[in-house]
């Protein structure tokens, strides 16, 4: 499938006991290359976890286009990640992207989008829906206000915004509907 960017996940997609090995495998794989002009974005573990510092130190070697920080609530979290990245060689041209997946983060979307080094936002619709205690709705009505708010913040700041994942990956018709909705926003 032709894509512009690939997000590699060291957070939710990796079991706790596999964090170190997943990190090592990812770094080795990315150093082999083979991605052409596709942007490589790496979602690290949250700064409040025991794995974030090791994630950052390890991925500096691959010089990713962006580091994606989960559960961003405010611009201070972006500044904290930037300060940690500045202590390592390899991040001189690396942007920071924010996972927008908490109610507090959504309310602070404009401040987050305007933070230094910000290059993009990724909607964490699953975690956001969980935090909002919403029911599943194929039209995503409970999430539309949050999606729209973040689109406005990202566009005003001139950064990229990416819609959340589609969970029913075998439902191509549903994927098309949700992708069209995301495109139209």
Task: Put a short name on every predicted segment.
Residues 1-185:
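Expand to "…catalyze enediolate/carbanion chemistry for C-C bond making/breaking, isomerization
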């Amino acid at each position: 499938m032709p894509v512009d960017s690939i997000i590699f996940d060291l957070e939710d997609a990796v079991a706790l006991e596999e964090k170190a090995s997943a990190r090592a495998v990812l770094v080795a794989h990315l150093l082999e290359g083979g991605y052409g002009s596709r942007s490589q974005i790496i979602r690290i573990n949250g700064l409040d976890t025991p794995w974030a510092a090791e994630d950052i130190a390890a991925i500096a070697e691959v010089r990713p286009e962006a580091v994606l920080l989960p559960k961003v609530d405010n611009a201070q979290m972006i500044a904290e990640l930037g300060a940690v990245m500045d202590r390592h060689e390899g991040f001189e041209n690396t942007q920071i992207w924010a996972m927008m997946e908490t109610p507090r983060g959504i309310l602070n979307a404009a401040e987050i989008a305007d933070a230094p080094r910000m290059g993009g936002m990724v909607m964490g619709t699953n975690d956001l829906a969980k935090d909002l205690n919403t029911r599943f709705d194929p039209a995503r009505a409970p999430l539309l206000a949050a999606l729209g708010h973040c689109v406005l913040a990202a566009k005003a700041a001139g950064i990229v915004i990416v819609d959340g994942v589609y969970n029913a990956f075998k439902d191509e018709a549903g994927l098309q509907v949700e992708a069209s909705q995301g495109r139209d926003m």
